[in-house]
Amino acid sequence: MKKKVLAVILTAVCTMGLMAGCGNSNVGNTNTQKNASSAEDGYKIGISQFAEHGSLDNCREGFLEGLKEEGIEEGKNLTVDYQNAQTDTGTASTIADSFVSAKEDLICAIATPCAQSAYNSAMNADIPVVYTAVSDPVAAKLANEDGSCVGNVTGSSDVLPVEEQLKMIRAMLPDAKKIGILYTTSETNSCSTVKEYQELAGKYDFEIVDTGINTSADIDMAATDLVSKVDCQIGRASCRERV
């Protein structure tokens, strides 16, 4: 019953769009962390975040603020276990497994790798998963083609308006020919967005030069190499916390 009540409240939170509040504030980098706030006789929620990044932090804060507005507040009737994967997909999977073992009432997953890990870990545990900051839930197999829920998971998308970005780049850089895109090869949403850029680039007389990276350790070298080949550069997916 408690999970059903929480699910209803979270539906209201999703409707208000509070989980999509992803901005661009800056934060410092820290080691993998676990912050737990305690509350007596209330809800337990595990929050898994893929990286230390302002926009992802805003998603987490917006999620908690939305719950607070619905009467579920950290330190009163809500216990939050926040863990950060520090851009490591293996760590994201371990975090998800730990939330299932802890029998959290719900898992909030921020960014695609955490969302996929949470869904895979919780699918047989009767623990609902709410995700945010997922650009392409369908490609990530977190939603059906019509946008409906897959299993016990729902959430919000931060899909980019690709064509509008191309229009803006053309207006700002009328002589530009090549756009560089740095993306994470292991993220389905990142790959699908690059494909969309490629499909639309010709319409605005652009050529897309893309470079895939496997880990955050590859970013600096890949970005330095890519910037020498293009007129402007776009950072995608997990690359955003460094580019």
Where on the chain are the PLM-derived regions?
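Extracytoplasmic "Venus flytrap"
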Residues: 44-70, 81-90, 186-190, 240
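Flexible loop/hinge segments that line or gate small-molecule binding clefts
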Residues: 117, 122-162
